[in-house]
A protein has these predicted regions:
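Charged, alpha-helix-forming regions
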Residues: 2-280
Length: 280
């Protein structure tokens, strides 16, 4: 994304922005990272919960430790075993983050924690953000506002990734589309290397499910159109726009309904992304 297309925030630091009720603020530096494709939906949800709990000016302080009730992590994990797996995944994942000036840093997503300490305070988890990551976030001025209820409703990590990516762009003035090379778009969605290699499979198992959930549950609409070089799809054009009042009401109503049966309810309410002839 070019500098001219970045959301303008009047140089307000991201960590000084106060989230509204029912939302979290996520620095743009943590939305489109490279190297996170192996993180599951549960891993990504956990990271968002830990980030939301630590969010604020203190997040930029090196070696600052945070404490959260394990019960607050139940929205992402039903068992301690799976929680341990996700904690370890975040600790061992090294991602590449791009700074506003185009330079990059390679950092871990999660630092020290006491989850395995038998003497830790019962029911609580202490953790830290790696100092290199904390330093990088200190001067962040670009962010997305994410609705917590929407984040909790997604059943696909591809939907979560697409929602976050568009949420950081939807506040842009006079910008409603952006082009991505296909490899960059795969990275944005979190598609693992070697999986969904043809565009037909990528469309069927990642793009369409993501569009279905994002368009049904969020307060904006998203389109993804393929772009070809010759007969081969080599990129995509993403488009977005805010929903009208009726569209927002419909999304809110769906969020209040049981998750069971949701796919059947929303299938057919979102236009097909591609004509059949462009599928490989």
């Amino acid at each position: 994304m070019s500098e001219s297309n970045r959301p303008k925030t009047n140089n307000t630091r991201t960590l000084d922005v106060a989230p509204n009720m029912g939302e979290m603020v996520k620095p743009a530096e943590l939305i489109e990272v490279k190297g996170a494709s192996r993180l599951t939906l549960a891993d990504r949800r956990l990271f968002n919960v830990l980030l939301r709990h630590a969010f604020g000016p203190d997040l930029a302080s090196e070696n600052r430790r945070f404490e959260i009730a394990v019960a607050d992590l139940r929205e992402t994990h039903e068992s301690n075993d799976r929680l341990v797996q996700s904690i370890e995944a975040l600790m061992t994942t090294v991602v590449t983050i791009q700074r506003p000036d185009g330079s990059t840093d390679r950092v871990q997503l999660l630092g020290w924690n006491n989850l395995s300490d038998p003497k830790r305070k019962r029911g609580n988890l202490k953790y830290s953000i790696p100092p290199e990551l904390a330093l990088l976030l200190k001067d962040s001025t670009v962010f997305a506002k994410l609705e917590l209820e929407v984040l909790r409703a997604f059943t696909s990590k591809y939907a979560l990734a697409l929602y976050e990516a568009v949420a950081r762009r939807v506040r842009l003035k006079h910008v409603f589309t952006e082009r991505f090379a296909l490899d960059d778009f795969r990275e944005l969605l979190g598609v693992e290397p070697g999986k969904l290699e043809t565009f037909g499979n990528l469309n069927q198992y990642a793009i369409k499910p993501a569009l279905l959930e994002v368009n049904a549950l969020s307060d904006f609409t998203v389109t993804v159109m393929p772009e070809k070089t010759g007969r081969r799809v080599t990129g995509v054009l993403i488009g977005w726009g805010a929903k009208d009042i009726e569209g927002r009401k419909a999304a809110y109503a769906e969020l209040q309904r049981p998750r069971v049966g949701r796919k059947a309810r929303i299938t057919g309410t979102v236009e097909e992304m591609l004509p059949p002839e462009v599928i490989e």
